UniProtKB/Swiss-Prot annotation:
Function of the protein: Transfers the 4'-phosphopantetheine moiety from coenzyme A to a Ser of acyl-carrier-protein.
First-tier enzyme category under EC: transferase
One Pfam family named in its UniProt record: ACPS
Family classification: Belongs to the P-Pant transferase superfamily. AcpS family.
MF (Gene Ontology): holo-[acyl-carrier-protein] synthase activity; magnesium ion binding
Enzyme Commission number: 2.7.8.7
Name of this protein: Holo-[acyl-carrier-protein] synthase
Cellular compartment(s): Cytoplasm
Length: 139
């Protein structure tokens, strides 16, 4: 059963301007170490670095909407991180207030699954997040 849906669309150049203006302070405040490492692996192409950050920013916004809180009520930027599953499919790794909110939304006898779709087509980045409750496997 679906327990939350969120989407976000962002101008990649806007993210680039914020990074230029605030640099490390912005990056440290918003992105996890894993997200920063992924973006910086693309360092040979500045547009790809900024697009990588923009897609992750959009995914965090979409996830916060799917959680029903936005970036408030104890859910903060670094509580949500885009990670890739072994097959490469993106998902969200939640901690802190975001994880607490997810646990509160997930009914007993179910586990949460977070599906993420991220894309970019310069100058836009977009993300969709669907949070589902999946019945626990019977032992």
């Amino acid at each position: 059963m679906i327990i939350g849906i969120g989407s976000d669309l962002i101008d990649i150049t806007r993210v680039g301007k914020v990074i230029e203006r605030h640099g490390e302070r912005f990056l440290d405040r918003i992105f996890t170490a894993a997200e920063r490492a992924k973006a910086e692996r693309r360092a040979k192409n500045e547009k790809m670095v900024v697009a990588t950050y923009a897609k992750r920013f959009a995914a965090k916004e979409a996830c916060s909407k799917a959680l029903g809180t936005g970036i408030r009520r104890g859910v903060w930027w670094r509580d949500m991180g885009v990670v890739n599953l072994p097959g490469g499919r993106p998902t969200m790794q939640l901690t802190g207030g975001a994880l607490a909110r997810l646990q509160a939304l997930t009914p007993d006898g179910f586990e949460a699954r977070i599906d993420v779709s991220i894309t970019d087509d310069w100058p836009l980045a977009q993300a969709f997040v669907i949070i589902s409750a999946v019945p626990l496997a019977k032992s």
